[in-house]
Amino acid sequence: MNNNDRLIRLRYALDIKENDMIEMFKLGGIQVTKEEVKKMLVNPDKFEEDEEVDPDSYIIVDNTVLISFLNGLITFKRGKKDSGKNEPPKVEEPLKNSLSINNEMLKKVKIALSLTSDDLLDIFYDVDVDISKSELSALLRKEGHRNYKVCLDRYARNFLKGLALHFRD
């Protein structure tokens, strides 16, 4: 699963409109146009091998762009942090391990939607994924912690599918 796919699935699950996505990117520290958002919502992996594809018809979303969007989602859903300073949002450093993007997505969506660990367990349960509290805790830990566990695409896909079931009813 690539970042374009994650963005597409998250947008569907939370029923986010394009204008709201532009605002979320802005809150996350990245300026994008409506056309750029549309190009980000194209998954380049879905094209057939023999199909001629114009490289200008899509934009590959990297980890930094996805993390900025998720930070903007948090700010959009929960409001700005009261730090007393009026600073522009800073773009986070890229992840050391590209596999941990699923962990970051899980953590940031949990924060944005004010979900508890029990809510996450319910979401996974609704899509028939058996995950214990300790496994979930390991997925939510900081990379480098001794009990940290990489969130595989299977968990990320099912989490986004469960979110869609919860929020699109």
Model-predicted segments: where are they?
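Short, amphipathic alpha-helical "recognition" segments used to contact nucleic acids or chromatin
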Residues: M1-L14, S100-A112
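Extracellular/lumenal glycan-associated surfaces
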Residues: Y12-F25, S68-K77, S117-I123, N158-F167
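Intrinsic disorder/low-complexity detector
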Residues: D62-N102, L163, D169
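Flavin-dependent oxidoreductase catalytic cores
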Residues: V91, N103-V109, S117, R141-Y148
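Positively charged, low-complexity terminal tracts
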Residues: P94-L95, L99, N103, F124-Y125, ...
